[in-house]
C-alpha cells in the first residue's frame, strides 16, 4: 500500500465534492460513508490490520479513517439532498470535514513512519 498516494486520494475528496456541487451531481453517499470500501480502507481492514493491527499508529489511522468517511458521507448526503450551500460550507476551512481530512492524513503518515512502509 502506498500511503503517500492514500493521503493524496483523501485530500482530493474536497475537490470531488466541490465538482459535484457545481455540476449538481448525485454521489454514492452509502459507499462514501463506509471506511472499508476505498483502497486504503480495504488495506486497513485487511493486510494492514494483519501486519500492523497491534501498533497504536495503526489503530489511530483506522479510527481517523473511519471518522473521515463518516464526515464525507454527511457531505455527500447534503449534496444528494440538493443542499449545495450547506455542502459547500461543510467542506470549508475550519470545518469538521477539514479537521478529519487533516487528521487522517497525519495518521497515515505516522503509520507509514512507524511501520517502515
Residue ranges and their predicted role:
Residues 1-117:
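N-terminal membrane-sensor/transducer module of prokaryotic signaling receptors
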Amino acid at each position: 500500500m502506498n500511503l503517500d498516494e492514500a493521503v493524496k486520494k483523501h485530500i482530493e475528496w474536497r475537490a470531488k465534492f466541490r465538482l459535484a456541487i457545481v455540476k449538481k451531481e448525485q454521489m454514492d453517499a452509502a459507499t462514501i460513508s463506509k471506511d472499508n470500501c476505498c483502497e486504503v480502507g480495504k488495506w486497513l481492514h485487511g493486510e494492514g490490520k494483519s501486519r500492523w493491527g497491534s501498533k497504536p499508529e495503526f489503530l489511530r489511522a483506522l479510527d481517523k479513517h473511519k471518522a473521515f468517511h463518516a464526515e464525507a458521507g454527511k457531505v455527500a448526503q447534503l449534496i444528494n439532498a440538493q443542499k449545495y450551500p450547506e455542502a459547500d460550507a461543510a467542506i470549508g476551512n475550519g470545518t469538521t470535514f477539514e479537521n478529519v481530512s487533516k487528521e487522517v492524513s497525519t495518521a497515515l503518515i505516522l503509520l507509514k513512519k512507524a511501520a517502515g512502509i
